[in-house]
């Protein structure tokens, strides 16, 4: 699928399998989400620009590379996205964090905003939106639209599992925003959940129902 990168790495596949298993405990699920998010972050940042600097090692001078370009913001969609943001911060601890509160109306399945807090200079940063599940796609579409209204132009979306419908919906609304995911599942059920998916990522992360 154009604009979609499926991170097909043995560690990612292994961790995702354990997350899909309904017998996996809340503690283990939370840890696996964090670990998998770190691996996905490694891939989504693969093409970051760098520049050459001169440094002194303990044994002599050398030229080496540092990251250049825009500073990063991780923007988890509350609440499930928080578990992924932690794993990404493990890899890029200097990144800022925005919070986007959206819930899915159980009848219309449309996204409803209830909270939005970002760094003041977010328009000047690379923003990576994170949400474990890209199901109907409505929540991701709404979150990205909200960020664009704040002036953000450099956006990426990262999830654990996407549905075909979710990918199509997000790409249709925001064709300029690339997607990274660990898997793409074929179906949604009548409640808008991905099948086979991994259940409600927020409930499984925080031990709620």
From Swiss-Prot:
Cofactor: record remark: Binds 1 Mg(2+) ion per subunit. The magnesium is bound as Mg-PRPP.
Known EC number: 2.4.2.9
Reaction(s) catalysed (UniProt annotation): UMP + diphosphate = 5-phospho-alpha-D-ribose 1-diphosphate + uracil
InterPro entries: PRibTrfase_dom, PRTase-like, Upp_B, UPRTase/APRTase, Ura_phspho_trans
Pathway(s) this gene product operates in, as recorded in its UniProt entry: Pyrimidine metabolism; UMP biosynthesis via salvage pathway; UMP from uracil: step 1/1
Binding site for uracil: 194, 199-201
Activity regulation: Allosterically activated by GTP.
SUPFAM superfamilies: PRTase-like (SSF53271)
GO MF, any single term: uracil phosphoribosyltransferase activity
Nucleotide-binding found in the keyword field: yes
Pfam families: UPRTase (PF14681)
Keyword list, A-Z: Allosteric enzyme, Glycosyltransferase, GTP-binding, Magnesium, Nucleotide-binding, Transferase
Keyword Magnesium: yes
HAMAP family: Upp_B
Family: Belongs to the UPRTase family.
NCBIfam families for the chain: PRK00129.1, upp
Physiological role: Catalyzes the conversion of uracil and 5-phospho-alpha-D-ribose 1-diphosphate (PRPP) to UMP and diphosphate.
Name the record gives this protein: Uracil phosphoribosyltransferase
Organism the protein comes from: Caulobacter sp. (strain K31)
């Amino acid at each position: 699928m154009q604009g979609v990168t499926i991170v097909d790495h043995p560690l990612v596949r292994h961790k995702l399998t354990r997350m899909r298993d309904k017998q996996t405990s809340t503690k283990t699920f939370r840890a696996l989400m964090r670990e998998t998010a770190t691996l996905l972050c490694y891939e989504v940042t693969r093409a970051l620009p760098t520049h050459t600097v001169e440094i002194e090692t303990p044994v002599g001078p050398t030229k080496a590379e540092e990251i250049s370009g825009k500073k990063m913001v991780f923007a988890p969609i509350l609440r499930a996205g928080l578990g992924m943001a932690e794993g990404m911060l493990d890899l890029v601890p200097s990144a800022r964090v925005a919070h986007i509160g959206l819930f899915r109306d159980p009848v219309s399945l449309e996204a409803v905003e209830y909270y939005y807090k970002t760094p003041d200079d977010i328009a000047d940063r690379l923003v990576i939106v994170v949400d474990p599940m890209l199901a109907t796609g409505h929540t991701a579409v709404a979150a990205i639209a909200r960020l664009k209204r704040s002036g953000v132009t450099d956006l990426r979306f990262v999830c654990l599992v996407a549905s075909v419908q979710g990918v199509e919906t997000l790409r249709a609304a925001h064709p300029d925003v690339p997607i990274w995911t660990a898997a793409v599942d074929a179906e949604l059920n009548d409640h808008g959940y991905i099948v086979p998916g991994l259940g409600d990522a927020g409930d499984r992360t925080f031990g709620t129902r």
